[in-house]
Swiss-Prot record:
Residues 1238-1297 form the LIM zinc-binding domain. CDD domains: LIM_DA1 (cd09396). PANTHER family: PROTEIN DA1-RELATED 2, PROTEIN DA1-RELATED 4-RELATED. Disulfide bonds: none annotated. GO terms for biological process: defense response; response to cold; signal transduction. Residues 178-427 form the NB-ARC domain. The gain-of-function mutants chs3-1 show no visible phenotype when grown at the permissive temperature of 22 degrees Celsius. Mutant plants (chs3-1) germinated and grown at 16 degrees Celsius show developmental defects, including dwarfism, with small and curly leaves, early senescence of cotyledons, constitutively activated defense responses and enhanced tolerance to freezing temperatures. This is Protein DA1-related 4. LRR repeats lie at residues 448-473, 516-540, 569-592, 594-615, 617-637, 638-661, 662-682, 683-703, 723-747, 748-770, 771-791, 792-816, 822-847, 888-911. It comes from Arabidopsis thaliana. Signal peptide: none annotated.
Amino acid sequence: MEPPAARVTPSIKADCSHSVNIICEETVLHSLVSHLSAALRREGISVFVDACGLQETKFFSIKQNQPLTDGARVLVVVISDEVEFYDPWFPKFLKVIQGWQNNGHVVVPVFYGVDSLTRVYGWANSWLEAEKLTSHQSKILSNNVLTDSELVEEIVRDVYGKLYPAERVGIYARLLEIEKLLYKQHRDIRSIGIWGMPGIGKTTLAKAVFNHMSTDYDASCFIENFDEAFHKEGLHRLLKERIGKILKDEFDIESSYIMRPTLHRDKLYDKRILVVLDDVRDSLAAESFLKRLDWFGSGSLIIITSVDKQVFAFCQINQIYTVQGLNVHEALQLFSQSVFGINEPEQNDRKLSMKVIDYVNGNPLALSIYGRELMGKKSEMETAFFELKHCPPLKIQDVLKNAYSALSDNEKNIVLDIAFFFKGETVNYVMQLLEESHYFPRLAIDVLVDKCVLTISENTVQMNNLIQDTCQEIFNGEIETCTRMWEPSRIRYLLEYDELEGSGETKAMPKSGLVAEHIESIFLDTSNVKFDVKHDAFKNMFNLKFLKIYNSCSKYISGLNFPKGLDSLPYELRLLHWENYPLQSLPQDFDFGHLVKLSMPYSQLHKLGTRVKDLVMLKRLILSHSLQLVECDILIYAQNIELIDLQGCTGLQRFPDTSQLQNLRVVNLSGCTEIKCFSGVPPNIEELHLQGTRIREIPIFNATHPPKVKLDRKKLWNLLENFSDVEHIDLECVTNLATVTSNNHVMGKLVCLNMKYCSNLRGLPDMVSLESLKVLYLSGCSELEKIMGFPRNLKKLYVGGTAIRELPQLPNSLEFLNAHGCKHLKSINLDFEQLPRHFIFSNCYRFSSQVIAEFVEKGLVASLARAKQEELIKAPEVIICIPMDTRQRSSFRLQAGRNAMTDLVPWMQKPISGFSMSVVVSFQDDYHNDVGLRIRCVGTWKTWNNQPDRIVERFFQCWAPTEAPKVVADHIFVLYDTKMHPSDSEENHISMWAHEVKFEFHTVSGENNPLGASCKVTECGVEVITAATGDTSVSGIIRESETITIIEKEDTIIDEEDTPLLSRKPEETNRSRSSSELQKLSSTSSKVRSKGNVFWKWLGCFPLQPKNLRSRSRRTTALEEALEEALKEREKLEDTRELQIALIESKKIKKIKQADERDQIKHADEREQRKHSKDHEEEEIESNEKEERRHSKDYVIEELVLKGKGKRKQLDDDKADEKEQIKHSKDHVEEEVNPPLSKCKDCKSAIEDGISINAYGSVWHPQCFCCLRCREPIAMNEISDLRGMYHKPCYKELRHPNCYVCEKKIPRTAEGLKYHEHPFWMETYCPSHDGDGTPKCCSCERLEHCGTQYVMLADFRWLCRECMDSAIMDSDECQPLHFEIREFFEGLHMKIEEEFPVYLVEKNALNKAEKEEKIDKQGDQCLMVVRGICLSEEQIVTSVSQGVRRMLNKQILDTVTESQRVVRKCEVTAILILYGLPRLLTGYILAHEMMHAYLRLNGYRNLNMVLEEGLCQVLGYMWLECQTYVFDTATIASSSSSSRTPLSTTTSKKVDPSDFEKRLVNFCKHQIETDESPFFGDGFRKVNKMMASNNHSLKDTLKEIISISKTPQYSKL
């Protein structure tokens, strides 16, 4: 039994082998480390955190040969910016870490927030390399920018991989991906299929998902090898033994009812079940099995693993997760662990390891098996791997043979052909060949892809190396029916001419006989063989369909000779590919009728033959570089041909008319130097290559698809007269093309013209009329000096490497211009009307600084204009690359490094349209543009109100690979983009407004990989651009930035006499300003007012950020304006005198400087006159006048300075004194404007944000100036000297409170003001409400407020709405809590082995059970309300089986009860808990009663009642303390028992408590601590005192109580 209290998530027993220790500084405990700890615990990893710092951590005292705390395997060391790396203690700490590593522990270093590279890299690199450690770095140190969440995920993945064995490598990342897929599904019965090739890890992943998620479901079942189990046991038996066992064990339903689950649907409709069917191949079996599971409740999950994607379609699986092979890092780790026993191989073994990884394509099973096969063979590893490739290990063969045996005969034939011959060929080509072989490949290939036998990549057919080698091995096992040949030795046996055979003798037969009639395919590589072929070699090969003879090493060498010629070729040939065919003709009787592809490059053919009836099957003809070929007239019979390649056939004199070939797409006649005429163009031609021909004329034609034409030679432009529909013309590398005449009227549809590297091209016609031209390539035309004009719709222009000096007016449509290496280019003319824009002027050194400035300014102006157009779909963008000019450095306001910080003020947020970013990139001599260049920009928006920072990332494409081949010296990239600005939806929320933005710039490749030291960012600068900006030049933007800063500073200086500025409404603020101030502010409206008058809207109610003038380079005029405004507002203040003196000094000094500047100008003119007149006398006069003027000026300056300070001193002629005094005057002015920072009286920290409250003789932060009653901040307009630091309502409540219940003033009596106040909730109410029937919550003991909703339970107890939200209403709902508390006991090393039920009952049933239990009521126990009881006797209990959760106003909630007979199997028969209490309170009562059960089960029945109840109260209090920890409240109660809670060795479930639940925990603890009863209150305090005095755990204290139970002191206790 126990008194009132509450609950929390239980701890889980720590597994020392899977635990982690974290050492960190206290500053990162509540940021990175808290998130890291939570993430590790979610993965079932126990975590202990030591936040004492690296220097004072308790681990520092552990000896090097001792294990870590709790036997943890992994130590995470978080190194933050507070660590002093050069202190003497740090090397000692590293030695300790080395000792832990030597002892078998794993150290994971994490560098977090370290902002100085020089502080870390020196020693860190040497340490990491020496210890072979892999570190994790935050975004400050890493080139790859990581957010905190990404860093945590990376660390957890690393730790997870180090804790678990090798077979779980790579599992964690795949678990996360599956979880993301499941979260996207609806809350109905969810399903997911895990698909992949054999050995890829489907079963391992499914088991990991099952183990990870099974605890979240009411029941779970994993059926391994489903097909085998189904066919062995049958449907009914499988359901009964696997699913029926769930019904029996979890829901107490007989397994015989599995075929009739509808009989118990009322019990099962809300049960969440997890079922995994592994390795499903028979889709019908799986479908019939799943049909019986339609009774699963919402939220259930079905997982199926299979190599066949069609299974998922049959079983109606919602989503499919494709298991990919391990990445390089994971595969290297797994293979290294398997073969070497370490996580990463040594450098000498890395090359072979990468070969194995590439071969198996990251297959985990193959990596493990190959690793074991190669273990211990280090010296012969290369040879062993070569043998394994040709004969895969039996285990791999067995796995893959199962997949092969499940295929149909047709599918097997296709697989074998692809494995031997067609891997890597295009899909259409393979289908054409196989269709003619009657294999029906169109459907079969899709089926094979679904079964993971084939893959389609970039329109080519691919096959895994393991499957390919296994298929070849399978085929070798069926040698008696050999149909495919690829081994040179066996092919040589069939084809070779032998003199023995000619003389009548027989050759020696190979071990396995070969039958020519059975052969269907021959693929011979002649690179390693050379022999003579007999003339009738192919005579009996009637079924030969594919013949390919090639040399993989050289295309020009043939290893075959035909001493007697070749008589015949098989009639059934579909593919004839013969490189370097040595004969002049094909056999005379050879029929081309079945050929699909004829490929004979580098052959000696003269012609193709004469016996040609029909070439309807021929699709491809390739006779390239056949130098002896003179005619190919047979092409006119190939009506379905698609490709003709006769490249390099220099002897070919004519090409037949192909105008009737409807399917012909590609014709390549390049290099056919003797062809003069092209008589007919195919109607559907797509590519026509005519380079190197003598063609002078092309006939008129109308192409259905405009072709891509490649031409060359002088004035070939005229050949295109009849190409009215041509879209692409390629004249690349035509070195003898000098001029191009104008035929624009016939090129109306030309889209792309490529004339790159036409090195002799000197002139181009005016191309203005080519309205369809979009892309023009002129790069590398080194002699081209002038271009007449460009088409108006041109989008991309490449003129790099030309001799152009001036570009004409560029079209407005132009989006991309590459002028790399235009060394003579001086000017450019372009309007920025179309965005985005991208211009490359790298290595263009003739541009003047004025041209650069004007060009950049035009881009920014256009960008601003386009940014205002909301209908613009694509965000405006400008990217300009130009060489860095030192004269322009000041214009871009650059600073060293790759980081730039930009300060913002609140009213600037809405009108910001983007940023102008200037990035200087230094290119070294070894830089070559092989991978492209991008600039990665990461903008971190520092937000108000402690909101998380917003990170906006953007990649700016500078140039693609080879676009700027070689870049030298420094170049500046000017970038503008609106995407760096957050979305409007975020801006409009006040909590998301930022006060500053930090930009980081990195150089990356086109694939976003970091580039090396040859290309790096050295300087950068960022300027804010607003939509209301008037002057958009670079200098104008800088001036506007300064003006904004001045205005902002003025607003922070202004001080009102009565009401603080920040507490006023905008209207009041405006009225309070002086007319001169309003006039000044209104005059700057064009620059600082935003849309909707944002400035005036927020100036009076949003805190402005102070700016330190010392940290900014201000002009003297800026200081004067600030001082003038300050003086206008402070005329009535006493310190105005000093400010006036400083202002007068500043103004007079300015006048002197201006006079000096005028004198200098005058003197310059006079010196020029003297130079021409050579009048020495005037020079002497001028010298004297200058000296007198200098002395006069010195006297005036000194006089003014001395007068400003109120002192008189002797004049000092030293110029250093003059500068020092002027500097002192400026500093004096700045100190007046920027007084020293004050400190808050409450938190003692400096007040840096410019907002403070000056009250009661002290200065406070606004959030620290709080009411003494409610501890909430007090607004400035609520401050009153009369009531002190109280809110007005709080002060009234303190002096004359209202009744919480009736909301009326508590009446005064003759004895004064009397009221009752709850000791914890601090709610005051009239004394009369204690007896007038006002509802009182049975849980939190609060009286109910009038008019509020409340609930009366069936046993007439009241429950408030807050407690009702988390109330546990029936016995089933209490079971998860029961299991959690059992785990909590286990974490205390007090595991309860025996099982007993826990029932929730009504109050009457609890009282009845108490009487039958015959509990001896003593003392105050009679007065206690019984809310829980631990039974030891058999009896019938009426439990609540169903409670109603509706919120009804003043109505009784009914329940459904059922009788349960508790049977005595041990010392405890059952535990009864009062139903309808909140989960927290129910958990506390259950923990209390389970402590009673523990005592009885362990034979402690005769303990003193006070000590027994005290032990139970302490246990309940510890459980509540655990809840306090999980809820992450501000502080943990200092009770001695709390320090012994098993927080460090347990893992609690994730909860999201409300504020009321957090307060309810503290209420329950308060009730325990303040209980005055002899049993519960005194017992708690006595046991707690014993634990504190001896520093014992609860279990040790129990042993101590037992040990003294026989002494005389025991009775006194």
